[in-house]
Amino acid sequence: MSTEPDLHAIGIDEGVAETRERLVGRNVPVIDDPAGASWGVYTDPSGAKVAFGRAEDGTEYTDANLESPHAYPAQGYRVSYNLAHFDLLEGGDREGRFLAYVDNPTALTLTEPNKVTVRPAALGAEVVVYASEDEYKQAQSEHDGLTLDAKHLKSPWLLALHSGDATGDEASSVAMFAAVVQSAQLRTNELTGREFWYVLGESVVPMAIALPAETAQNLHPGAVIAGAFIIVASVEA
């Protein structure tokens, strides 16, 4: 049994098969689309979500997701069955471009951009916590090479997709991400009984963030969380 980092971030330490077994009997609606694919979303009282489904080619997936209070206008389209490309258009300007695993894939078309409302979130995979923006900046200054501010979201797979060096099936939503904590709360995932951090933070835009419980003893407003994150989203067409 191996734990997927996105599931671990929301308090699920079992593997994919065990997680799906836990969903049996939860009466999660499953949506079938005409192309032969299907998908469903379990929403936990804690705000944690588990998206699962089967693509047109029969490939199955199980991904973590997260409820977020922050919604933004965007242009979005799918690059594979459940991986989507988004341009955030807050205030009419592009505020960010990123890839995200979506929990409701049929809200987007494949390759053709749609105007949608998106609720992005970030799930911590390899995370460093800094006590303040000053501490984060100091740590950045001690490293040679690329330095990023405390509110960034960089999807490395974007360049490969746009250049044609990678396909949507090869890409992922893993990103370099940092945010300043606005609030943080230890919540219990009722599906498993395990805790995780539910964080509201300001990155390129404010969004919800999930971190494994062991990430920090005390996350506080003004702290900076940075590292490798899995970006996810819910779409309102």
Predicted regions and their residues:
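Long, hydrophobic alpha/beta structural blocks
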Residues: P29-D169
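Short, surface-exposed polybasic-aromatic patches that bind anionic ligands, especially phosphate groups
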Residues: M1-T3, V205-M207, F229
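Short nucleic-acid-contacting surface segments enriched for D/E, G, S/T with interspersed K/R
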Residues: P212-A228
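A general secondary-structure signal for short beta-strands and their flanking turns/coil
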Residues: Y81, E95, P113-K115, V174-M176, ...
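OB-fold (S1/OB) nucleic-acid-binding surfaces
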Residues: V181-I209
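N-terminal alpha-helical "arm" segments
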Residues: M1-N27
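Extended boundary segments
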Residues: P156-N189
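Short, Lys/Arg- and Gly-enriched loop/turn segments at beta-strand edges
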Residues: I230-A237
